[in-house]
């Protein structure tokens, strides 16, 4: 599967999941860059009407995972046995918003055979930085036994 098809694949596979419930849209997903967007809506807010930190962090984690998946699966097509799992995540929440669309852009810091480290910046519709998230993901190999 060509790398430019991963965004459509993720949007399709997200149907019925928490990702779809939130309204996440995978815009670009390659092994070099993943861009996801999320529109503001009241169900994603905390008590004062701004984005809930969990919604921002979930979007960033989805971007990290998508990029790592594109790396792990390569051109071979969708393989659940190669789907990466976040094992560590660090988030710095810098500001917040109560309107518009937020955008997460993930880039790789390290892509190995068994792990990936991905950095994601989340920005508001005015390109103001909302959060910086770094995640370490384990890359299971196809056919590996889980325990």
Predicted feature locations:
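Terminal targeting signals and extreme-terminal segments of soluble enzymes
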Residues: 1-147
């Amino acid at each position: 599967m060509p790398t430019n098809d991963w965004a459509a694949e993720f949007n399709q596979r997200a149907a019925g999941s928490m990702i779809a419930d939130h309204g996440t849209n995978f815009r670009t997903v390659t092994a070099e860059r993943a861009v996801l967007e999320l529109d503001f809506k009241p169900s994603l807010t905390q008590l004062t009407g701004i984005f809930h930190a969990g919604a921002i962090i979930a979007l960033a984690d989805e971007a990290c995972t998508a990029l790592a998946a594109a790396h792990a699966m390569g051109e071979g097509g969708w393989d659940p046995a190669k789907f990466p799992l976040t094992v560590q995540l660090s988030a710095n929440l810098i500001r917040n918003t109560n309107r518009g669309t937020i955008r997460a852009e993930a880039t790789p810091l390290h892509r190995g055979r068994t792990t990936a480290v991905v950095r994601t910046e989340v920005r508001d519709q005015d390109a103001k930085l909302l959060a910086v998230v770094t995640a370490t993901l384990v890359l299971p190999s196809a056919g590996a036994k889980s325990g």
